[in-house]
UniProtKB/Swiss-Prot annotation:
Source species taxonomy: Bacteria, Pseudomonadati, Pseudomonadota, Alphaproteobacteria, Hyphomicrobiales
Protein name in UniProt: Carbamoyl phosphate synthase large chain
Keywords: Amino-acid biosynthesis, Arginine biosynthesis, ATP-binding, Ligase, Magnesium, Manganese, Metal-binding, Nucleotide-binding, Pyrimidine biosynthesis, Repeat
Similarity remark: Belongs to the CarB family.
Alphabetical list of NCBIfam families matching this protein: CPSaseII_lrg, PRK05294.1, PRK12815.1
Residues covered by region (Oligomerization domain): 457-614
Species name: Agrobacterium fabrum (strain C58 / ATCC 33970)
Length: 1162
């Protein structure tokens, strides 16, 4: 059927900030959807609060709203834009839940907006655990034995009362008067939400208590309408049961949880299905989880296609997944269906389905080359699968052809437990990973070992690992059994280690429940390692190629034979053992593919030499190295820069070649670059690609400055291999990181920096610290995201840092060199990567400056003033652009210093400088002559694609010409609007972790608030980050002495807005002296009832709290945790408190308006 002509404009809801469970994959799907719908001539309206996304680039949609994704704000956008249709399936759970809220609020009916892609009834049936269970029973599919706990009866009664009030207003009023009355009614309803939610939770808890007798323990708890398993978990005892139920009911927007029988240890599979309105259904790909049931699929190591199913089992699962889509009513688009299979008797049960594009869809798209999101968007507007061409085969096949795979794909998740001391590393049904890596090989062994080295955690393959608690003797087996039986990020390596220590494959399976086929594959790798250790490296091509075909990296072979990777590479080259490149083409080479989407393999054909499908061009080419798997400190912002580099280089006439291994990102989409290599970012893998590309055409150079720390680490190896690096020279990047060289440069330029020192050993660290004095900031060199960076207040704290924190940074190869010498390990590490010490500047204002330079000319693109004081990592700080409080003289001086630094470092491209300003003096904290995570935020705010401009500069253009290619030169200091960037944190995923911020970065994502008024921009940034600013209630305030004057302004604004004030003793007395009436409440350590009780009883709606000593910080940890669990906004700086107070005042006045990004720049 042809596309619909009755629709002219379509609203797409994005996913918002990057959070655990919802990452870059929705930028990838949203970007594809925007392009697909614009291609068909529709007016596309987009809402997404995440500035670091490609989809929010102003050229992608016709109207781009970088506004908070809340039902109330999206309702304003609908009222303004009047779209004909709403597509909710491209923005994850956020978009689905927002769309359903808009439906329930009557907004879609009021403005006659049709939901396309998934009907509300289908979303409800898939996401509501009760309706889903009933639907599966109707088609004869089993679900695990379960029971629901919800508050449906009392919720229905509340809703009926609300609906009656709406009906009454509609009968009495009309026109603008009716609209205003309905809006007031909705506001009243929304203000009562917290109280209603508590009633619903209490009601549902009583029902849940009965489930233990029905389902038994252990039980799996799954909240409705949440993503990434938020709020869910596995309860092994009654106290865990009630704790998880409480959290799950709170997390579920519908206050409902499913309590399910345990299927722990069963095999888990997923089917990625696409259906059109003519009922054509295709399976894009099957995915198998190596980890058995009990671990969230986002935290599992997975393979595609499924490798341990018989054809009969596969066909049964295929038919079942199609039946699920038909029954649920997913008429158009992609869905993901999850199954569990009991390995003992083959019993198949359906776990759940996602009626939308998901994380697994992104993986399936990258694994097969099939653009699920693009196809789903076109199906939503009326096309059928047979009417759409498959882009990958250049239209040789229609989209109705099921993809076929002649390779194995492995995905491994990346975790960040080191950022959250106290968090449990045990994996459950609630997702905890922050990123993932994907690798492709001709065999499972090859793709697994490629994925392991692509993780960038220091692994070179299936490296050895220490078994926790292992000691020779009687109890040794128990430690091994516990290690392989407990799901943790390192379990696969523990399994390999158990087999190295003599455990049989049967015993490993019995304890880990991992399928015997995968265990046999791991055993083959372990056995081969033993042979290599015993016999050394083979000296002939055939046997060396066989090892490489199993996925062994040069670095792994070197470590097994006590050689250096360089020696292995030299042997390999002398024997001409080189990889070939194969194409991902959706059709297993049945049709020629014009799309250059490639992976490397060392396969040996039966006859002749292995054939490479790289088909290298003779054009001028530039290679862009991506950022690898997402992690805290290196995420979507760097992928945005890499994508912009590819777009700009294509504009400038170069062939853009991308190398990356992250399946979530836009950079690994088949049409972002001219050629894509889906490969690990290691020196060996990248150099092999360079050699292939150098066979024809001219390799102009490589861009290493856009992908974060990952590609920068490869710069030296690339240079040694004669590969030109574009932009700032690696030596200058090193100068900025090398404390001694950098200090000399600052002295030469007459720029100030805090009193500092450098330590190459534990002893030297103690001496340097005593010279500088406390408090001081310590950090390792050459790290991103403030890894292991701390503020040290005392000798004791320094001792803990040196002996507990630093050992966690020691790589495996050094540990193996000094197995029993902890100090030797630390000193070896510090000899190469010394510790950097700086005097900590208390109460200083921190400033981030982004700039562009072509070696001679400098353009300062943004001066951002942090709302948090210096000492909190810049990635975790809220900041405003333009600056709010800095004088013209200070801004002029910041520009002068930045220009001097850029010229001295001969920067070619982007540069970021961090400054602290204290008592009128500007101190340089650090300089990064590369892309920073603020680049997308600055670009969106000033209306200039600075990463594109930088890429053109790096390829040889002059700065002014590169700027002119994208319009007029902006004036970042004189904008008519103000933007606020706010960070988003994953603390709710890690119970027991303190939420206090410091110099080590812990945020996963960010949002932007954009307005002509600072208070409203800040309000939008808070709403976008999920902070629900109260409009009324009680504020609790307890601040240290030096903040008492500073807090007055915020408290006065809140009192004027009708807030009551609660305060601890000293703060209450001070406020009374200033004429502010505050009620006294006990600190936690002063006896009950205290402030934590008041927060847990929901008597406090806002908290302003600062502490001045280590003891006070630890004393107030439970208070901070309580605010997090009760979702109470919590501010720890006076600037933040005042901004929040101004925002609340503006929201109360009803001033929040929405504007598309394009309108800020005419």
């Amino acid at each position: 059927m042809p596309k619909r002509q009755d629709i002219k404009s379509i609203l797409i809801i994005g996913a918002g900030p990057i959070v655990i469970g919802q990452a870059c994959e929705f930028d990838y799907s949203g970007t594809q959807a925007c392009k697909a719908l614009k291609e068909e001539g529709y007016r596309v309206i987009l809402v997404n609060s995440n500035p670091a996304t490609i989809m929010t680039d102003p050229g992608l949609a016709d109207a781009t709203y970088v506004e908070p994704i809340t039902p109330e704000v999206v309702a304003k956008i609908i009222a303004k834009e009047r779209p004909d249709a709403l597509l909710p399936t491209m923005g994850g759970q956020t978009a689905l839940n927002t769309a359903l809220s808009l439906k329930r609020m009557g907004v879609l009916d009021r403005y006659n907006v049709e939901m396309i892609g998934a009907k509300p009834e289908a979303i409800d049936m898939a996401e509501d655990r009760a309706l889903f269970r009933e639907a599966m029973a109707r088609i004869g599919l089993e679900t695990p034995k379960s029971m629901l706990a919800n508050a449906t009866e009392i919720k229905d009664a509340d809703r009926k009362t609300h609906e009656a009030a709406r009906t009454e207003l509609k009968a009495k009023l009309s026109g603008a008067e009716l609209d205003k009355a309905l809006d007031n009614l909705e506001n009243q309803w929304n203000l009562g939400e917290t109280d209603r939610k508590q009633r619903y939770i209490s009601h549902a808890m009583a029902i849940a208590a009965q489930a233990i007798d029905v389902v038994g323990l252990p039980a799996i708890i799954r909240p409705s309408f949440t993503m990434g398993g938020t709020g869910g978990g596995i309860a092994y005892n009654r106290s865990e049961f009630f704790e998880i139920i409480g959290g799950g009911l709170d997390a579920s927007p519908t206050t409902e949880v499913l309590i399910e029988e345990s299927v722990l240890g069963w095999k888990e599979y997923e089917m990625e299905v696409v259906r059109d309105k003519a009922d054509n259904c295709i399976i894009i790909c099957s995915i198998e989880n190596i980890d058995p049931m009990g671990v969230h699929t986002g935290d599992s190591i997975t393979v595609a296609p499924a490798l341990t199913l018989t054809d009969k089992e596969y066909q049964m699962m295929r038919n079942a997944s199609i039946a699920v889509l038909r029954e649920i009513g997913v008429e158009t688009g992609g869905s993901n269906v999850q199954f569990a299979v009991n390995p003992k008797d083959g019993r198949l049960v359906v776990i759940e389905m996602n009626p939308r594009v998901s994380r697994s869809s992104a993986l399936a798209s990258k694994a097969t080359g099939f653009p699920i999101a693009k196809v789903a968007a076109k199906l939503a507007i009326g096309y059928t699968l047979d009417e759409l061409e498959n882009d990958i085969t250049g239209g040789a096949t229609p989209a109705s052809f099921e993809p076929s795979i002649d390779y194995v794909v492995t995905k491994i998740p990346r975790f960040a437990f080191e950022k959250f001391p106290g968090a449990s590393p045990i994996l459950t049904t609630a997702m905890k990973s922050v990123g993932e890596v994907m690798a492709i090989g001709r065999t499972f062994a090859e793709s697994l070992q490629k994925a392991l080295r692509g993780m960038e955690t220091g692994l070179t393959g299936l490296d050895e690992i220490e078994i926790p608690g292992y000691e020779e003797g009687e109890g040794s087996k128990n430690a091994i059994r516990a290690a392989i039986g407990t799901p943790t990020p390192d379990r696969l390596r523990m399994v390999a280690q158990a087999m190295r220590m003599g455990m049989s494959e049967e015993e490993v399976h019995e304890n880990s429940k991992i399928d015997p086929w995968f265990i046999a594959q791991l055993k083959a790798i372990v056995d081969m390692e033993a042979r290599i250790r015993e016999h050394g490296l083979p000296q002939d091509a055939e046997n060396l190629r066989m090892l490489k075909a199993m996925g062994f990296s040069d670095a792994r072979l070197a470590s097994l034979t006590s050689k250096r990777p360089k020696e292995v590479a030299e042997l390999r080259n002398s024997l001409n053992v080189r990889p070939v490149f194969k194409r991902i083409d959706t059709c297993a080479a049945e049709f020629a593919s014009p799309t250059a989407y490639m992976y490397s393999t060392y396969e040996t054909p039966f006859v002749g030499a292995a054939r490479s499908e790289a088909q290298v061009s003779d054009r001028k080419k530039v290679v862009i190295l991506g950022g690898g798997p997402n992690r805290i400190g290196q995420g979507i912002e760097f992928d945005y820069c890499c994508c912009h580099a590819a777009f700009a280089l294509k504009d400038a006439g170069f062939e853009a070649i991308m190398i990356n291994c992250n399946p979530e990102t836009v950079s690994t989409d088949y049409d972002t670059s001219d050629r894509l290599y889906f490969e690990p970012l290691t020196a060996e893998d990248v150099i092999e690609i360079m050699r292939a590309e150098q066979e024809k055409g001219e390799l102009v150079g490589v861009i290493v400055q856009f992908g974060g720390q990952t590609p920068l680490k490869l710069a030296e190896a690339l240079e040694k291999n004669g590969i030109p690096i574009l932009g700032t020279a690696p030596d200058m990047i090193d100068l900025a990181e090398d404390r001694d060289r950098f200090q000399k440069l600052l002295m030469k330029l007459d720029l100030a920096q805090p009193n500092n020192g450098i330590a190459y050993s534990v002893e030297q660290a103690r001496l340097v610290a005593s010279e500088i004095g406390f408090p001081l900031v310590v950090r390792p060199s050459y790290v991103l995201g403030g890894r292991a960076m701390q503020i040290i207040h005392s000798e004791g704290q320094l001792q803990t840092y040196l002996l507990d924190t630093v050992p966690g940074l020691v790589p495996e190869d050094i540990k193996q060199r000094y197995p029993n010498d902890k100090t030797g390990q630390i000193n070896t590490l510090l000899g190469k990567n010394p510790l950097l010490f700086d005097s900590y500047l208390t109460n200083a204002v921190e400033v981030d400056v982004d700039a562009l330079c072509d070696g001679e000319n400098v353009f300062v693109s943004g001066i951002m003033e942090h709302i948090e004081e210096a000492g909190i990592h810049s990635g975790d700080s809220a900041c405003s652009l333009p600056s709010r409080s800095l004088s013209k003289e200070t801004l002029d001086e910041l520009e002068r210093q930045t220009t001097a630094l850029a010229k001295a470092l001969k920067v070619g491209g982007l540069m970021n400088v961090q400054y602290a300003i204290k008592d009128g003096t500007i101190y340089v904290l650090e300089v990064n002559p590369r892309a920073s995570r603020t680049v997308p935020f600055v670009a969106k705010t000033i209306g200039a694609p600075i990463a594109k401009i930088a890429a053109r500069v790096m390829a040889g253009e002059k700065l002014d010409a590169a700027i002119a290619a994208y319009g007029e030169k902006p004036d970042p200091r004189n904008l008519k609007h103000i933007a606020v960037k706010e960070a988003v944190f994953p603390f709710a995923r890690f119970p027991g972790v303190d939420i206090l911020l410091g110099p080590e970065m812990r945020s996963t994502g960010e949002v932007i608030g954009l307005d002509t008024d600072f208070a409203l921009a800040f309000a939008k940034s808070q709403l976008g980050a999920g902070v629900d600013l109260p409009r009324s209630g009680t504020v609790f305030v307890s601040v240290r002495d030096e903040d008492k004057e500073g807090v007055l302004s915020a408290i006065r604004i809140l009192v004027e807005s009708g807030f009551k004030v609660l305060a601890t003793g000293g703060t209450q007395r001070f406020l009374a002296e200033q004429g502010i009436n505050a009620e006294k409440i006990n600190k936690v350590q002063e006896g009950r009832p205290h402030i934590e009780d008041a927060i847990r009883n929901r008597q406090v709606q806002l908290v302003i709290n600062t502490t001045d000593s280590n003891k006070a910080i630890s004393d107030s940890k439970s208070l901070r945790r309580a605010t997090l669990m009760q979702k109470v906004p919590y501010y720890t700086t006076m600037a933040g408190a005042e901004a929040a107070a101004l925002a609340i005042k503006a929201l109360k006045a009803g001033n929040l308006e929405v504007k598309p990004l394009q309108s800020y720049f005419n």
